Amino acid sequence: MKVFSDQSRPVSNRPAVRALVAGSVGNFIEWYEFGVYGSFSTVIAAEFFTPEGTGAAEGLVRTYASFALAFFFRPVGAAVFGRLGDRVGRRPVLILVIALMTGATTLIGVLPTYATVGALAPWLLTFLRVLQGLSAGGEFGGAVALMTEFAPPGRRGLYGAWQSFTVALGLLGGAGIAALLATVLDAGQLAHWGWRLAFLLTLPAGLGALWLRLRLEETPSFRNGTVSGAVREVPPAREVRAAIALGVGRVMGWSAAGYTFLVVLPSYLQSTLDASFQQALLATVLATVGFAATILPAGLLSDRVGRRPVMLTGALLVVALSVPLLNLLQDDGTSTAVKGAWVFGAGAVVGLMAGPGPAMLAEMFPTSVRHTGLGLAYALSNAVFSGCAGLIITESVERTGNVDIPAYYAAAACAVSALALVKSRTGKGSWSDAGDRADVRDVVRRDRRGGGRAEPRR
């Protein structure tokens, strides 16, 4: 089997498969850590952010503030590492960010707690979270550029969907490890040292991902752009900013709903609905399995019918179902099986947005600014609508007493995304040999007309 680069030159499919694996492993590690942090948020709050005299709710808010701060460094990482990726290549930047992510996550597993070093503990944790935010900002743009630029014609949706799929696997792995540790250890062991094991497991996985990325080739788009000079032809800044803003609007629903259902849910169920730690983790696992189940089919479907209709369906379903879902979870009369099915379905609906999302963002930018542009659009959306989700929801519930806040938050963000998708449609794949060299203005104009059709298989 052969695949074709942007210049229609046949190449072996081995580099494409290697790129898919190397990009996926890095994404898995990044999101495994976020899954672990979310799952152990109540434990981390007690160990790092809850000195004597501080209430549990206040400690949890501080934990989510640290979580949000890391997200606000993602756009910085996307800008810095994205510019490097557009100048020197995707490969060296992806090597650098996986090393940074692995080191920061492993160090969290050996940090002293508040009981040992006092107020220094939360500052050390926050510093490592900042390093993770910087590396995560560079990871997404590089990984998606890597996967979609190696994708065969007409398969960018499927290849890009692997980024989201490994996000789901990472979150599932984090929640699964947390659930396993909660099962085999008692509460005291888990709180004092058990949670550290989940972070320390990052080290061997990170070393494996680093080895894979050291063996990568540079992407065909970047190599060909370097030869032709296209990577030095940067579009006007105002056009890039307009495309980034459009991208943020399209993916904010995916960001908000994804984090509400997949990351914030465990602590919400424990702190607001008095669920046990094991029950909260089970709900997260079910939601994440549903999320993973629809991502690849949604990406593949978007190669056939377009990114817009698939993502729009997911956004509208979140708007319609968020409040009924939360009311069902609050109802003591509803069986556990029914609640589990609805939680699974909530994750599956988010997968409809996450599957086509990476390819949609990649198709909005030419090679010369792709790493930067798609990375910034995703990082800005996540910084505001994901990183702040836990903080906003927890603080709002605490202040208002309204336990439906998570549903309103996810539904409102998806409503805005639906409007952005309706106004500016995405085709079945809009960059091609010529489109990849076009500036962002041409991409956006074509997008508003409905986009191009997928490239035929050669």
Labelled PLM ranges:
Residues 38, 241-290, 386-390:
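Extracytoplasmic gate region of multi-pass secondary transporters
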Residues 78-89, 295-307:
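Helix-to-loop junctions at the C-terminal end of transmembrane segments
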Residues 87-98, 304-315:
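Cytoplasmic membrane-interface "Motif A"-like loop-to-helix N-cap segments
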Residues 99-118, 316-333:
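C-terminal ends and interior cores of transmembrane alpha-helices
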Residues 209-216, 412-440:
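Multi-pass alpha-helical transporter architecture, strongest
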Residues 368-399:
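A late C-terminal transmembrane helix in Major Facilitator Superfamily
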